[in-house]
């Protein structure tokens, strides 16, 4: 059987996390079907990507050492189809791409396929700024848009965005040595499409039954404009005082993902008129270029042509009353969480108190005092040392704590 690797390299905000959730959740069943998704933890492919590209990432890179090689070892030991998926791979340099492909056996008997999922820029740009905000960035939306439109792309924001979102460039780097029929471009359907259509496209490409592995959870809802403005300002207050691991737990997961996303009545973020025209022109140019390349398109290139403009609400100058309402909701959420944690802490303190009292009662027994004396004597008395050894053999390893 020919070893086959499907290498999904992005882009962010195109259903990648959603697909990875399905693959990770069903990895045991997929293995029975002959498809390997090699992961012992949900972020295994993320850590492997960090390792491959030697990216700093809030301290997580320290966990990533050797992760790429471990992933590759699993893939190369598997005789059938394997899937690797993480969106940050899209920004890999040509040198890093060459290392990745060579390590996976591209020059040997491995059939490597490059998978890239794309969405129109008019939706991608606002989504990327919101993702920045959720990762504790505090840059205003207007400045973010200016950075992206800078022809020099001198800012870190622009370099990252275009590194993972400029479709022709990403595929130039990843697919230069790959036959065109093994380069698969999955397009994200336009708004209003069947919500399962994107998954059906991925499933068809991966060779699995979309119905058997149908997602049960709804996709993550986006932050609205006032919520985005509020979280950005919150970042300004927290960035110098709150460690990354606490921000991930309290702000990104608990506050944003579980509570503020999808808050009713909030307008969704879009582009101002001039940025919309610019992004639309870029999108059409991109589609024209991709149409000439002969890649396998899973979907329709027209999906990458932006739809009509929607009304723009500026998060940098939004109605302060609405932002304040979002802030009050956030305060209520945090207060409830603080109360829950205090109750849990009080319960744990009570359990510790009970266990401490039980331990003290045990230490007061004649048996325990006798064992303590025997242990103390064994340091200087050979007979006591032999007696302790015999006692431990009779009682087993559990007595070694004495």
For the regions a language model picked out, list residue spans one by one:
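Anion-recognition interface
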Residues: 1-402
């Amino acid at each position: 059987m020919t070893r086959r690797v499907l290498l999904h390299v992005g882009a962010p905000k195109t259903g990648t996390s959603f697909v990875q959730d399905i693959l990770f959740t069903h990895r045991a069943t997929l293995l029975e079907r002959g498809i390997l998704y090699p992961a012992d933890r949900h972020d295994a492919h993320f850590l492997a990507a960090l390792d491959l590209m030697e990216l700093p990432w809030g301290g997580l890179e320290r966990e990533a050492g050797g992760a790429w090689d471990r992933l590759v070892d699993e893939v190369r030991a598997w005789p059938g189809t394997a899937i690797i998926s993480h969106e940050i791979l899209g920004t890999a340099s040509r040198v890093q791409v060459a290392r990745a492909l060579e390590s996976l056996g591209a020059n040997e008997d491995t059939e490597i396929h490059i998978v890239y999922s794309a969405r129109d820029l008019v939706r991608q740009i606002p989504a990327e700024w919101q993702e920045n905000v959720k990762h504790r960035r505090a840059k205003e939306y207007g400045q973010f848009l200016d950075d992206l439109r800078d022809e020099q792309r001198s800012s870190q924001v622009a370099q990252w965005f275009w590194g993972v979102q400029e479709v022709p460039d990403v595929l130039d780097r990843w697919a230069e040595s790959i036959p065109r029929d093994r380069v698969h471009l999955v397009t994200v359907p336009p708004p209003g499409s069947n919500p399962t259509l994107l998954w059906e496209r991925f499933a068809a490409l991966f060779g699995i039954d979309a119905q058997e592995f149908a997602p049960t959870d709804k996709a993550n809802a986006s932050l609205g404009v006032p919520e985005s403005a509020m979280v950005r300002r919150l970042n300004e207050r927290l960035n110098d005082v709150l460690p990354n691991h606490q921000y991930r737990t309290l702000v990104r997961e608990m506050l944003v993902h579980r509570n503020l996303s999808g808050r009713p009545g909030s307008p969704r973020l879009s582009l101002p008129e001039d940025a919309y025209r610019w992004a639309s022109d870029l999108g059409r140019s991109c589609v024209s270029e991709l149409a000439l390349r002969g890649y396998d398109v899973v979907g329709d290139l027209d999906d990458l042509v932006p739809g009509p403009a929607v009304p723009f609400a500026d998060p940098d100058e939004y109605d302060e009353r609405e932002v304040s309402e979002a802030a009050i909701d956030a305060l209520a959420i945090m207060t409830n969480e603080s109360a829950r944690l205090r109750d849990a802490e009080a319960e744990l303190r009570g359990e510790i108190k009970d266990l401490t009292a039980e331990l003290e009662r045990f230490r007061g027994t004649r048996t325990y005092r006798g064992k303590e004396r025997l242990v103390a004597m064994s340091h200087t008395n050979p007979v006591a040392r032999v007696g302790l050894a015999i006692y431990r053999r009779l009682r087993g390893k559990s007595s070694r704590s004495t």
